UniProtKB/Swiss-Prot annotation:
InterPro entries: Ribosomal_bL28, Ribosomal_bL28/bL31-like_sf, Ribosomal_bL28_bact-type, Ribosomal_bL28_sf
Record-given protein name: Large ribosomal subunit protein bL28
Keyword Ribonucleoprotein: yes
Gene: rpmB
GO biological process, one term: translation
Signal peptide: none
Length: 77
């Protein structure tokens, strides 16, 4: 399973670890992904999504029904 948020599309980005001696080695910054079950009142069932913390805030703000409708329209769910 890829490390991509289903709501925001956020994925890993690359950067550097930098030591005290200013040595640089490559690293990945991973999004804060969580598996979360959301209750959809219109469908009377749970929907399980892999979302970032930012994605959960978007769902809290706009509502799960609106977000799900957009994901289904775009073919992401």
């Amino acid at each position: 399973m890829s490390r991509v948020c289903q709501v925001t599309g956020k994925g890993p980005v690359t950067g550097n670890n930098i030591s005290h001696a200013n040595n640089k080695t490559r690293r990945r910054f991973l999004p804060n992904l969580q598996h979360h079950r959301f209750w959809v009142e219109e469908e009377k069932r749970f929907v399980r999504l892999r979302v970032s913390a930012k994605g959960m805030r978007i769902i809290d703000k706009r509502g799960i029904s609106v977000v799900l409708a957009e994901l289904r329209r775009d073919g992401k769910v």
